[in-house]
């Protein structure tokens, strides 16, 4: 048992711009009937979220889901957050934004490579405290903000704005593309997971 979720993270929006952008996206989702207008549905470990709207079926692929089904709430996070994929979120590698080479965290037998995760762990702690969260690349020696590193196997993403869809079937590619457009062309991360 558990709760499945999908997250869209805006990696570029500033802390100051996160709430206004979130309000515009929520207004669009409400106008399209994808979610309800008021936060009334409980979100696991948080306050209320937006209930699924009458047109939810237009933005999801429910072909593998038995009937009847009902989508859970949408949680909108508008604060600096490390979003994760829940259970078993253990990335294999991360790609440097400068040289584009991967820093591997595990060897071919999936044993942890000693010290490989340390720069990321330190950067996460710094980032969560409001710092830049710089990570020095083991290959090119350049330091880059944690939010600019890619990969991480869909396990982690960092940003000031995230939308978590609880208990929804897979979001359609067309919906995800329109969602990205509504975020103003910012870099986004899409993750799915389970708690």
PLM region descriptions:
Residues 1-93:
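N-terminal alpha-helical interaction blocks
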Residues 96-99, 137-140:
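Short cysteine-rich clusters marking metal-coordination/redox-active sites
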Residues 104-106, 146-147:
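Short, non-ligating residues that shape and space the ligands of small metal-coordination modules
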Residues 151-195:
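Long, contiguous alpha-helical scaffold regions
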């Amino acid at each position: 048992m558990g709760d499945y979720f999908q997250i869209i993270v805006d990696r570029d929006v500033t802390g100051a711009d996160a709430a206004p952008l979130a309000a515009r996206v929520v207004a669009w989702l409400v106008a399209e009937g994808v979610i309800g207008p008021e936060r009334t549905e409980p979100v696991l470990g948080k306050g209320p979220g937006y209930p699924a709207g009458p047109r939810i079926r237009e933005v999801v692929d429910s072909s593998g889901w038995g009937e009847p089904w009902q989508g859970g709430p949408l949680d909108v996070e508008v604060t600096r957050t490390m979003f994760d994929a829940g259970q078993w979120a253990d990335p294999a590698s991360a790609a440097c934004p400068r040289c584009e080479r991967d820093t591997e965290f595990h060897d071919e037998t999936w044993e942890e490579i000693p010290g490989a995760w340390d720069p990321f762990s330190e950067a996460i702690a710094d980032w969560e405290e409001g710092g830049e969260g710089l990570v020095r690349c083991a290959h090119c020696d350049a330091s880059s903000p944690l939010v600019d590193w890619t990969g991480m196997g869909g396990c982690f993403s960092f940003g000031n704005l995230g939308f978590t869809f609880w208990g929804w079937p897979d979001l359609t590619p067309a919906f995800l593309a329109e969602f990205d457009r509504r975020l103003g062309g910012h870099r986004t991360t899409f993750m799915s997971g389970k708690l």
